[in-house]
Amino acid sequence: MLLTRRFSSALARSPLLPRSLPPPRAVPATPPAPRPPPRRLMSSSSSGWHHSSRPPPPPPSGADKDQLFRGLEAALGTTFSSEPLAPPPQPMILVISGPSGVGKDAVIQRLQEEREGMHFVVTATSRAKRPGEVDGKDYYFVTKEEFLTMIERKELLEYALVYGEYKGIPKQQIRDYMAKGYDIVLRVDIQGAATLREILGESAIFIFLVAESEEALVKRLIHRKTETSDMLLVRVATAREEVKRMNNFDYVVVNSEGNLEGAVKQVESIIDAEKAKVHKRTVNI
Ligand SMILES: Nc1ncnc2c1ncn2[C@@H]1O[C@H](COP(=O)(O)OP(=O)(O)OP(=O)(O)O)[C@@H](O)[C@H]1O
Ligand SMILES: Nc1nc2c(ncn2[C@@H]2O[C@H](COP(=O)(O)O)[C@@H](O)[C@H]2O)c(=O)[nH]1
């Protein structure tokens, strides 16, 4: 009330106020009775138009707006700051996991093409390079001995034996990119996601990628033609167990046949929603 009165009288006194604007109304001593909620505007064909008895005042001109702005500043006794009102976004860690063949790499590749400011961590592996794979892009291909040295030196945030081969996440890569303000994307198998949950807790976002059905997943893996039938059997049997661990994740995204774009969009929506959170996750690696 006091502020309103100060404001009204300061506005009335202010030489900056445009003359054409009506003088500020007196503040009533007692608060007015609550008004009924405003009715929604309805179409002109219906009988529900809500007419105000007075026409709205004409919009102020550019100069008037400027004067009003300065008048408000004078009334409050401070200038209006142009500093952002929302806190700056913090770099975040996104963990994308799911059964083998579900499309993790495919989704990540599209995300990489779509979004800037994200770093997709290249993990290290002792597995042999597949045709078409590039060292430093798909993986850092190292020998088993080199991998064991990385473990010894505590260079890996997480590592695991995946289908008989070592896979692990270089810590320094995450630190370097987070320091530059990048968001981090990690692609791991389900056991890797469980380990990362223990290390990172709620500070990272965990997304479980699934196919629309087991049948679709198996067909996708067969179609990829990267595994022998024995290896396929292991991956498919593992996938059956892995789907049961969905509850440890924050989000589930369905990557259905022929709709890779839909899955990518959904992951993007998750990122956007997380960025808009008031209470943000803070990461410390
Ligand atoms: N929505 C989709 N519809 C059809 N095919 C897809 C879709 N998403 C991915 N694929 C294809 O499915 C195969 C498996 O995808 P991808 O290699 O990305 O899986 P992954 O989860 O990374 O597997 P892994 O864990 O074994 O590395 C690839 O041939 C890919 O092109
Ligand atoms: N736990 C970890 N899993 C990883 C890591 N890097 C990749 N992966 C996962 O391994 C499987 C098999 O990969 P493939 O290239 O041999 O088909 C797949 O699910 C990857 O996501 C890692 O650093 N840690």
Swiss-Prot record:
Its EC number is 2.7.4.8. Residues 91-272 form the Guanylate kinase-like domain. Residues 1-66 are annotated as: Disordered. It is found in: Plastid, Chloroplast; Mitochondrion. ATP binds at residues 98-105, 255. One of its GO terms (molecular function) is guanylate kinase activity. Residues 1-42 form a transit peptide. Disruption phenotype: No visible phenotype under normal growth conditions at the permissive temperature of 30 degrees Celsius, but mutant seedlings develop chlorotic leaves with aberrant chloroplasts under the restrictive temperature of 20 degrees Celsius. Its main location: plastid. Residues 1-19, 40-50 have a biased composition (Low complexity). It catalyses: GMP + ATP = GDP + ADP. The active site is at residues 130, 224, 235. It holds the Pfam family Guanylate_kin. Monomer. Essential for recycling GMP and indirectly, cGMP. Essential for chloroplast differentiation at early stage of leaf development. May not be involved in the synthesis and maintenance of the organellar DNA during leaf development. Belongs to the guanylate kinase family. This is Guanylate kinase 2, chloroplastic/mitochondrial. It comes from Oryza sativa subsp. japonica (Rice).
